[in-house]
Each structure stands twice: as C-alpha cells, then as structure tokens.
Amino acid sequence: MGSEIPDYYNKTLASENNTVATRNSGFPVWEDYKGSVDDLQYFLIGLYTFVSLLGFMGNLLILMAVMRKRNQKTTVNFLIGNLAFSDILVVLFCSPFTLTSVLLDQWMFGKVMCHIMPFLQCVTVLVSTLILISIAIVRYHMIKHPVSNNLTANHGYFLIATVWTLGLAICSPLPVFHSLVELQESFGSAWLSSRYLCVESWPSDSYRIAFTISLLLVQYILPLVCLTVSHTSVCRTISCGLSSQDSKLEENEMINLTLQPAKRSGPQAKLSHHPKWTYSFIRRHRRRYSKKTACVRPAPAGPALESREGRPPGKVGSMQSQPPPSNKFMPGVPTCFEVKPEENSDVPEMRVSRSIMRLRKRSRSVFYRLTVLILVFAVSWMPLHLFHVVTDFNDNLISNRHFKLVYCICHLLGMMSCCLNPILYGFLNNGIKADLMSLIHCLHVS
C-alpha cells in the first residue's frame, strides 16, 4: 500500500494467472477509465510539479541547516534531519513514478523497477512516519524527565537504525508479490496495441487484505495514537508546570509589592532584624477571601530581649498593621492579623509578572503547534489509507471513470505532508530556524 499506485488492473486481472491479458478495444471500462484523468492531466502535472519542488526544496534546506552544526545538535534535531531526508526520498520515489503511471496507463520502467519501486515507495513513507513517532517519544521523555535526560547521539543512531530496519522488514513482501503483466488490446483477430502494467499479485485476497490492514495500523493508526498521547502529555506537563510557576511568581510579586515602601508615604518604619522575626504575606482562597493577611511569629518574651530589640514594627512600608496586644503573643505560635492600607497612600495594584505572561504565551504556542502537527498528519494521510481499504474490500464502490482522479487527490494530500513537515518541524524550531537563517544569509552573500 504505502504510497505506491494501487493499480486499477489489480482488480480486473486478479483472476489471471498468465503474463498476458487480452482485452477488447471496444470495452467501455477502458475508455471511461482513461477519461477520468485526461481532462485534467495538465493541471495534475502542474500540481504534482509544484508539490514535489516545494517538498524537495523545503526538506533540503532543513537538512542542510541541521548538517551545518551537527556536532552541536540535540537528538530531536538529529531526528528532524533524518525526517527531512526521508521526505526527500518520498518526493523523489513517489511523485514522478506515480504520476507517470497514472497519465500513461502503463508501466514504463521495466520489470526490475516493477519489483523495486513499490518497495522503495512503501519503505520511505513508513520510515518518515516512524520518525515522527520517534520525535514525539523523545520530546515526551525530555519533558517528563528534564533532569535525568541523558539522550546522546548514540540513542539517535539507534532510533534511526531501528526505524529503517522496521521499515524494510514490514515492506519486504512487496518485491515478492509484484509482477509485470502485459495487457494487449485487440479488435477481432487483430492485435492493436500492448502495454505493460505493474500489479500486485498476491496468492489470495486474504493476503492482500491482511497486508493492507497491517499497513493501516502501522502507518496511520499507531502514529496517530502515539502523537496524540505524547503531545497531550507534553501539553499537560507544561500546563501543570506553568500553574505552579504562576502561583510562585504571583506570591513573590505580592510580597515585593507589599514590602516595597510607597514613594509618597510618610516616614517609614524599619523592620526588625531579629532572626526569629519572620514575615510572610499570603493570599487566602479567592472564592472566600479577598483581603491580605500577615502571619507574624514573635520572638520569645523576655525583659532583656525586649529592651534590646524593642517591639515588632507596627508599619510595613505604607501598610498599617494592627496586631493584638503584645502580652497575648505566645512564643513560637504564629499570630495572624489583617493588613490594611493607609487611606491616603497609593498602594500599587497586583499585576501579573512579565515572566508569567511569557510562560503563558509560550505554553499556548506549544499547544497550538502540537495540535497542528496532529491535525496535519491525520488529515493528509487519512484519505489515502481509506482509499486503499475501500478498494481492497469493495472495488466497485468507486466508479471506473473517477478511480484515478480520486486516487490522485488522495495521493497529493499525502504528498502535502512532505511539504508541511519542514515548516512544522524545522521553521518553527528556534534552533533550526536560526541555523536556517544563517544558511540563507551565507547563500545570499556568496
């Protein structure tokens, strides 16, 4: 399956055991089948050319940017470079051969290429998908274990070797079960023309359906589940970290604003420097309380200590405190009292720190980007996989006239992922983006 063309003649020649199939030239299905694409062949050529050039140039730039400073790159950047390389192979192997077979209605590249090319097409698409899973897993590991994150270049090499091994192993049946079939057109006893078709020749339909379902699971459902679970966990971890950081920064902000003297206030009282006097300002539950409170832990009572250190301050900056009488303080027991601002003083309002705003903005950016990654993968590859499943189980569901046109649309959507991956994984990566801008500047200067 993968990205190779599921030749229309697989279903019409499935019962043929010979290498030559005869078809009458007046057979209406043949003409209907050709007419679906002939009307749009120039549009398809232009669209395939645009998508191929865009995917090739975008992935080539990302690959060059990653290779410029490969000794300083992380495991994620190493995987992104391999993703760009695999997408280049997808563009080179899938677009030209598929478009040629669709427009010419025949296989022009010989028997050997009939066995090799579907295999290479399937492998490159599968490897690209498995690398997406690897990137998601590595990002999840880095977010969940930031302190113990010890991924090295050897881990990247191991992941790439595993990905290519799995791709080659899963797609290995394709070279065996592809064959070149000669299709001849005749009119009565006269032979008009002949053409060769590269078709899948499975021992039975059950083998073909089993292989299609396997590729559906490995190439689409498993990656989609992994991307969704991994990116959801990453977003949740970032959100939890942001909440704790938010509350910590708000508390520090409130303490700073409370302890900072007002500029237009009167004489300021000095805080006691006794080590056992501590001040901590807290904000109670927002739903029940709206006032600030202060908890003061006084020093142990004693005449000598009181004569040296004096009483605790009654003012903190521009804030007027009203504690209970000193004879009611109990040593070692915090006493909470209300902190009220002076009537004529300008108390700065509580404002959200710029650090919190930056963290929130970054969290939203990460959430949107990961959501787009999932949607792009799901939308771009879903039509092609559905097309393969539908045609394998019910080949009459799509009319003969529109068969190729529907396939080309599904195939182009899959190719669009190769154009969008450089943007989503490269241009939106700050490190790769900086290297890319430097590379473009060097190319422009030279």
UniProtKB/Swiss-Prot annotation:
- The positions flagged as glycosylation sites are 10, 17
Checking Pfam families in the record gives: 7tm_1 (PF00001)
The record's InterPro entries line, in alphabetical order, gives: GPCR_Rhodpsn, GPCR_Rhodpsn_7TM, NPY5_rcpt, NPY_rcpt
Task: Tell me the SUPFAM superfamilies matching this sequence.
Answer: Family A G protein-coupled receptor-like
**Disulfide pairings:** 114-198
Q: Where is the lipid attached (S-palmitoyl cysteine)?
A: 442
PROSITE patterns in the record: G_PROTEIN_RECEP_F1_2
- Side of membrane Cytoplasmic, spans: 64-77, 139-156, 230-369, 429-446
The transmembrane segments are 43-63, 78-98, 118-138, 157-177, 209-229, 370-390, 408-428
- Could you tell me the Gene Ontology terms of the biological process aspect for this record? cardiac left ventricle morphogenesis; chemical synaptic transmission; G protein-coupled receptor signaling pathway; outflow tract morphogenesis; synaptic signaling via neuropeptide
Q: Where is this region: Disordered?
A: 297-325
Q: Does the keyword Cell membrane apply?
A: yes
Q: Which GO terms describe its molecular function?
A: neuropeptide binding; pancreatic polypeptide receptor activity; peptide YY receptor activity
Q: Which PANTHER family has this protein been placed in?
A: NEUROPEPTIDE Y RECEPTOR (PTHR24235), NEUROPEPTIDE Y RECEPTOR TYPE 5 (PTHR24235:SF10)
* Protein name in the entry: Neuropeptide Y receptor type 5
Organism per entry: Sus scrofa
The major lineage groups are: Eukaryota, Metazoa, Chordata, Craniata, Vertebrata
